[in-house]
Amino acid sequence: MISEYVDEEIKRREDYSLRRLKGIPNDRRLWILTCMDERVHVEEALGIRPEDAHIYRNAGGIVTDDAIRSASLTTNFFGTKEIIVITHTDCGMIRFTGDEVAKYFLDKGVKVNELQIDPLLPSLRLQSTEDFTKWFKFFRDLGANSPDDIALKNAEILKNHPLIPKNVTISAYVYEVETHKLRKPHQRLYELTSRFEHGTVVKE
């Protein structure tokens, strides 16, 4: 009956609008950490809808203190059971270092060794130029040479963090801006194809 369909749609819209008040988790119980780069089309790559996941973006898709804050809230209080970390190719965070950025701001007269990093927590201050360079978390400063390395490092940090429940599934992927597809870290499709062509069987 039409009335049943209308009633169902009304309830669906109500649940969507009031899901936090009703304690309803996102549809896939999923939290995604990825880069703010507009070329990373997360929903398309994963085949999900906006209501399926909480998506957290920052420069580089890096695990930061605020990323951990958000991840801990969604997994402990919003019913999230899975975390997916997505970095991407051609990321600007691999092109620079914290030292280069520190010099840029120092040349502008900014005292990078005296910065208050959280307006609500005045005691949290960067007390040296070295602190400032580490705070930006450029890939090379983290000992990573590729988005693949960062994806794996991010996943490992989250898996071992005391604020993230141990029963949460955590996975890492790399989004290729050239193909708009996801792949596992260090497993480029053309490399796998080349191994098969040369008679090498790939085992996971």
Swiss-Prot record:
The keyword Hydrolase applies. GO terms for biological process: hydrogen sulfide biosynthetic process. Its cofactor is Zn(2+). Its EC number is 3.13.1.5. Binds 1 zinc ion per subunit. SUPFAM superfamilies: beta-carbonic anhydrase, cab. Pathway: Sulfur metabolism; hydrogen sulfide biosynthesis. GO terms for molecular function: carbonate dehydratase activity; hydrolase activity; zinc ion binding. Zn(2+) binds at C35, H88, C91. It catalyses: carbon disulfide + 2 H2O = 2 hydrogen sulfide + CO2 + 2 H(+). SMART domains: Pro_CA. InterPro entries: Carbonic_anhydrase, Carbonic_anhydrase_sf. Keywords: Hydrolase, Metal-binding, Zinc. Belongs to the beta-class carbonic anhydrase family. Catalyzes the conversion of carbon disulfide into hydrogen sulfide and carbon dioxide, with carbonyl sulfide as an intermediate. Likely plays a key role in sulfur metabolism in S.solfataricus. Does not show carbonic anhydrase activity (hydration of CO(2) to carbonate). Forms a hexadecameric catenane homooligomer, through interactions of two interlocked octameric rings. PANTHER family: CARBON DISULFIDE HYDROLASE (PTHR43175:SF3), CARBONIC ANHYDRASE (PTHR43175). This is Carbon disulfide hydrolase.
